[in-house]
């Protein structure tokens, strides 16, 4: 029975272990097991297969590597078989009695030394793969040194484990700048940190350059463009900004905030281009639908290893009216005729502009479920500044202030002449950190309400720093909207930009960096003692919602937000004694 099961097994090309057929994945150029796919990631399997193929040819096989089972079509196996057929015939090895399956008491290194000293390498026939005691179950000889070197070489293809020189020699096409993209891999998929950051910064720089031209054209109402193009752009621009989301994962939300017309390949004169920020509040700008759809497709990880087969319009949905839950396919609004300016956009499909002075309220934080899957993608539910190397890919202050523009003469253009974006407000907060609202020089600065602390989620910093409790997705308050937000939140201290922050429950004054912020209602601010008592009153079981007692839903969703376990642990930490303590 054991021999029957062994004969049914297939060898994984990466780990060289026998696997049952149901544990194998055949969607790549070589058969790999599901364990390797899950561990490495489907987007890196082809790269690792290529690295393993090069290593097997140049490093492992000349030292006596077995050709493996005949069921797999390994190129290295074919090369070795051809070389063995053409080379000089070696004398047959002397039979050495050994117990089956264990190799006896003789070490693998001793057998390797005897084989090399006699001028031969052990290359048994496929019929003896499962019977020779000197061979492992995967067809490899018991040469521990060689096997260990091969294992390290194969695992070394992961970043940080393999020296750059060895990887450059093993992977074809690797230059001094690092890995190049393998065929079939999307440019938006990260390979190595430095290369990905450079590529991301270059892409953002190109997008911002195009966005600058679009904003200049918007200010001039696209003077010099054909009438149909101008009317179409003005009509669509009057609807911006509006939310878009990925059709297969509703937690991936962005927003379209600008439009432009670009030169079109032969056949049409102009082509519609839209600019999307994804994720909301991140400052990452994508020019065109395909780029943002590809990134959302990659973040969703529903179909790993595959790529978009269309322009991306069928993968995105837009919200026709903010907060209504009415989502439609983006292709229904931007049809082929609309994108080529041959016909106007249908009036009944046009989204309604969200009439909110503060653009931060447009996109709420994504639901909790998708925020735990991906580390590379900034889908964290926070509004804290991130100074570590991300400023190069962000929009400039002038472009940030322009990204939530409304039509001149519109109903809100006079009310918000200088409303900054959330990113600009966060930068102001970052510069003002360390200054209490009680300081004399802090009265004229921006309101440090809205959870404008470096408090993010409990996974970002250790609890001993006590800087991370606020779950504020997009609750930043700008100077012009500060009075409305503070008075609406019930601070009761006047509608001045320098008004102190007060707890919604006990009305005590809050320290500017030590409080809990509701991500849905900007006016819900709570001190640590009140939050701690509320959490203790809820008991250990069940979800803990907003300390106000309401189940505040996430913006654009009916699902109420709840504290994460790490945040609860941080709030319940007993070393926080007072509300107004200062950082050293």
UniProtKB/Swiss-Prot annotation:
- For bias type Pro residues, the affected ranges are 354-369
- Mind listing the UniProt keywords for this protein, alphabetically? Coiled coil, Isopeptide bond, Metal-binding, Methylation, Nucleus, Phosphoprotein, Repressor, Transcription, Transcription regulation, Transferase, Ubl conjugation, Ubl conjugation pathway, Zinc, Zinc-finger
- Give the EC number(s) under which this enzyme is classified: 2.3.2.27
Q: Which residues carry this modification: Omega-N-methylarginine?
A: 177
For the region Disordered, give the residue spans. Answer: 60-127, 346-420, 433-495
Gene3D superfamilies with a match to the protein in the record: Interferon regulatory factor 2-binding protein
Query: Does this UniProt record's set of keywords contain Ribosomal protein?
Result: no
User: What subcellular locations does the record give?
Assistant: Nucleus
Kindly give the InterPro entries that the UniProt entry links to this protein: I2BP1/2_C3HC4-RING_sf, Interferon_reg_fac2-bd1_2_Znf
Provide the assembly information: Interacts with IRF2. Part of a corepressor complex containing IRF2 and IRF2BP2. Interacts with JDP2.
- The protein in question is named Interferon regulatory factor 2-binding protein 1
């Amino acid at each position: 029975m054991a021999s029957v099961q062994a004969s049914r097994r297939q060898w994984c090309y990466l780990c060289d272990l026998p696997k049952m057929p149901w544990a194998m994945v055949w969607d790549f150029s070589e058969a790999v097991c599901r364990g390797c796919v899950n561990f490495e990631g489907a987007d890196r399997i082809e790269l690792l297969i290529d690295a393993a193929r090069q290593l097997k040819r140049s490093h492992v096989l000349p030292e006596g590597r077995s050709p493996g089972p005949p069921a797999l079509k390994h190129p290295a196996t074919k090369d070795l078989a051809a070389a063995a057929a053409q080379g000089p015939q070696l004398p047959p090895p002397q039979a050495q009695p050994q117990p089956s399956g264990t190799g006896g008491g003789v070490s693998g290194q001793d057998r390797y030394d005897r084989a090399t000293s006699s001028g031969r390498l052990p290359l048994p026939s496929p019929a003896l793969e499962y019977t020779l005691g000197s061979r492992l179950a995967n067809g490899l000889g018991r040469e521990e040194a060689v096997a260990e070197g091969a294992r390290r070489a194969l695992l070394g293809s992961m970043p940080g484990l393999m020296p750059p020189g060895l990887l450059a020699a093993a992977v074809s096409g690797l230059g001094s700048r690092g890995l190049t993209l393998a065929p079939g891999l999307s440019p938006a998929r990260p390979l190595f940190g430095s290369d990905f950051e450079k590529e991301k910064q270059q892409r953002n720089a190109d997008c911002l350059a195009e966005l600058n031209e679009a904003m200049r054209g918007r200010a001039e109402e696209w003077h010099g463009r054909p009438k149909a193009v101008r009317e179409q752009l003005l009509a669509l621009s009057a609807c911006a900004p509006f939310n878009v989301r990925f059709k297969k994962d509703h937690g991936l939300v962005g927003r379209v905030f600008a439009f432009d017309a670009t030169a079109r390949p032969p056949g049409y004169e102009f082509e519609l281009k839209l600019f999307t920020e994804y994720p909301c509040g991140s400052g990452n700008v994508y020019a065109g639908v395909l780029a943002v759809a590809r990134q959302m497709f990659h973040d969703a990880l529903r179909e790993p290893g595959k790529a978009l087969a269309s322009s991306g319009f069928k993968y995105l949905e837009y919200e026709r009216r903010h907060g209504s839950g009415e989502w439609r396919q983006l292709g229904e609004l931007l049809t082929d005729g609309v994108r080529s300016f041959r016909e106007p956009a249908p009036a009944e499909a046009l989204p309604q502009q969200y009439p909110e002075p503060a653009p931060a309220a447009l996109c709420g934080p994504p639901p909790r479920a998708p925020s735990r899957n991906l580390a590379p993608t900034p889908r964290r539910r926070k509004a804290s500044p991130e100074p570590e190397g991300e400023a190069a890919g962000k929009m400039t202050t002038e472009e940030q202030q322009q990204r939530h523009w409304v039509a001149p003469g519109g109903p809100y253009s006079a009310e918000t002449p200088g409303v900054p974006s959330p990113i600009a407000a966060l930068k102001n907060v970052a510069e003002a950190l360390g200054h209490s609202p009680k300081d004399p020089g802090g009265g004229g600065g921006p309101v440090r309400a809205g959870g404008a602390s470096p408090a993010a989620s409990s996974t970002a910093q250790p609890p001993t720093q006590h800087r991370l409790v606020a779950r504020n997705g997009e609750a930043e308050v700008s100077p012009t909207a500060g009075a409305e937000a503070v008075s609406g939140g019930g601070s009761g201290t006047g509608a001045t930009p320098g008004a102190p922050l007060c707890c919604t429950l006990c009305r005590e004054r809050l320290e500017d960096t030590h409080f809990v912020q509701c991500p849905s209602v900007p006016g819900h601010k709570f001190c640590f003692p009140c939050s701690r008592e509320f959490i203790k009153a809820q008991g250990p079981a069940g979800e803990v919602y907003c300390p106000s007692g309401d189940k505040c839903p996430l913006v654009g969703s009916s699902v109420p937000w709840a504290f994460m376990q790490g945040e609860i642990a941080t709030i319940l930490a007993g070393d926080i004694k007072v509300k107004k303590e200062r950082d050293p």
